[in-house]
């Protein structure tokens, strides 16, 4: 199989010699193209070992040179046939072409399955899911390429949710993009920025936060202060120039409850949950321009338009992560305080009635449940970053906590659907996308389903551990951190099995721990499971 994969390389090397013998001058040109667009670029760019995505397109020029040499293989074989047959004619070129077609045929046969994307639609579906999780006329703030381009594709090509305004915060450092956001796009209204161009065009790339006032300052007053040209609103620098700054670390964002309900940001029945004021905490002493523009947006939107975020990272420096609602993919800014609980590890509140139809009917997952679809590391990472599978478990837990009529059945349906749409055979186990399912299955009384998932996850962890433990010396040191991680995951589900009284699961894991040298004193007793920590409670 390896030899078949190297056919192209062997042909390239042989035909490189053929061109050198027949046409040295042009050989030099192609060789320089190969070197300068390949090895030289590797040295020049000094590319890091880990990249967010494949960067092989940088070396496309060297691929062209490689292909030129492979193409010379037809000429080389044709000359060989002429020498052997001692005849020259059109048939010699035909025979050479037919024989050489085996090269791309072999390469296709060996590599097609790894590169076939005919059934894979995950890149498009990520954008679909983000857009469908937003309210009408919303502004969705995103951060990177992976949560921007799929949304643009859905809007501009497939005409999906063109009422939503997509705003990439990493572009807000450019005055051209801010100007663009101030204009209408498709069916989406402009972003209600208020800062004049003189305050963001080629100035204020970084903005100081100097707390002249200890108390929280109304966000509108703070932006009026920043917008002012009064010399008293500036701070001098050592070179004599002055710069704008924000005068408070805590900003108060008043809540217009009627507007929030009218825009669909909060349900009428949740009116009493709303706070009167949302407080921003500017944790750093300096903001970049994108953060300044987000503050400007918040100071002026008056809760008339929903604001969604694809990543909570955008809000961490503004101290707003306690005012979010998770809608399956995006996070909605809501005037409801939901403090982050480290024991649970979930950011924001959740409305199970809102998220249930989205998860069960609306969202798409790129056909990853189809075994024909190759789920590469890039898809794995994006599903992990968006919390796609654990969203099902989180919604299930919300139903179980509420405990209303039919809520348990909905919870189980969510758990089953999450594993069906993104099966472990395709989407690899991680602690974050598996452990919540175990908690919820056991809390719902679905012990057999919980056991099956737990044992499958445990077997996967044990295979990793057996592989890592086979390394010794320096290599063993290199994987020691991975061993610790897998042991920690195994220990967590072991304690959960004990807490839930799953005797067969505990016994299976006890057997494995004994192979690692554990004694009976170190293990849970099957008939007397141990007590869990707070973090292991199925329903917090």
Regions found by a protein language model. Give the residues of each.
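ER/secretory pathway lumenal C-terminal domains and tails of membrane proteins involved
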Residues: 1-4, 9-10, 14-59, 65-137, ...
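Residues that form or flank phosphate/diphosphate-binding pockets in enzymes
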Residues: 149
């Amino acid at each position: 199989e390896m030899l078949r994969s190297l056919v192209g390389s062997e042909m390239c090397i042989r035909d490189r010699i053929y061109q050198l013998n027949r046409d040295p001058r042009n050989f030099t040109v192609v060789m320089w193209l190969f070197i300068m667009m390949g090895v030289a670029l590797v040295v020049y760019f000094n590319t890091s070992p880990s990249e967010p995505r494949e960067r092989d397109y940088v070396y496309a020029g060297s691929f062209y040179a490689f292909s030129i040499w492979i193409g010379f293989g037809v000429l080389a074989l044709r000359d060989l046939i002429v020498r052997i047959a001692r005849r020259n004619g059109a048939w010699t070129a035909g025979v050479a072409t037919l024989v050489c077609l085996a090269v791309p045929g072999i390469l296709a046969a060996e590599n097609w399955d790894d590169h076939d994307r005919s059934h894979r639609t995950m890149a498009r579906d990520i954008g679909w899911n983000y857009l469908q999780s937003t309210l009408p006329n919303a502004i969705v703030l995103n951060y990177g390429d992976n949560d921007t381009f799929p949304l643009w594709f859905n809007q501009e090509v497939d005409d999906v949710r063109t009422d939503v305004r997509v705003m990439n915060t990493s572009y807000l450092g450019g005055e051209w993009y801010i100007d663009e956001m101030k204009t209408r796009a498709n069916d989406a209204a402009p972003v209600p920025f208020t800062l004049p161009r003189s305050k963001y065009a080629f100035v204020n790339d970084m903005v100081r936060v100097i707390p002249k006032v200890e108390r929280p300052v109304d966000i509108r007053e703070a932006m009026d202060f920043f917008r002012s040209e009064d010399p008293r609103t500036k701070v001098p620098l050592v070179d004599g120039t002055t710069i704008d700054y924000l005068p408070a670390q805590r900003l108060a964002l008043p809540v217009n409850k009627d507007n929030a309900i009218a825009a669909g940001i909060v349900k009428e029945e949740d009116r009493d949950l709303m706070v009167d004021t949302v407080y921003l905490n500017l944790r750093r002493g300096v903001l970049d321009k994108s953060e300044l523009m987000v503050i400007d947006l918040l100071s002026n939107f008056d809760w008339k338009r929903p604001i969604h975020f694809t990543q909570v990272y955008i809000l961490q420096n503004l101290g707003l992560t306690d005012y979010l609602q998770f809608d399956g993919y995006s996070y909605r800014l809501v005037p409801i305080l939901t403090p982050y609980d480290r024991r649970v590890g979930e950011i924001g509140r959740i409305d199970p009635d809102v998220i249930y139809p989205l998860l069960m009917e609306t969202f798409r997952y790129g056909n990853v449940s189809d075994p024909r679809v190759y789920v590469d590391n890039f898809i794995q990472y994006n599903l992990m970053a968006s919390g796609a599978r654990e969203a099902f478990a989180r919604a299930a837990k919300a139903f179980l906590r509420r405990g209303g009529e039919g809520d348990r059945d909905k919870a189980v349906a969510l758990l089953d659907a999450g594993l069906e749409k993104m099966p472990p055979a395709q989407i690899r186990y991680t602690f974050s996308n598996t452990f919540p399912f175990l908690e919820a299955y056991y809390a719902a009384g679905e012990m057999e389903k919980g056991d099956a998932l737990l044992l499958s996850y445990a077997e996967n962890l044990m295979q990793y551990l057996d592989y890592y433990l086979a390394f010794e010396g320096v290599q063993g040191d290199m994987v020691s951190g991975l061993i610790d991680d897998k042991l920690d995951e195994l220990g967590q589900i072991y304690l959960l099995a004990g807490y839930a009284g799953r005797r067969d699961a505990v016994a299976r894991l006890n057997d494995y721990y004994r192979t690692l040298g554990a004694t009976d004193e170190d293990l849970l007793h099957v008939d007397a499971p141990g007590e869990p920590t707070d973090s292991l409670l199925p329903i917090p």
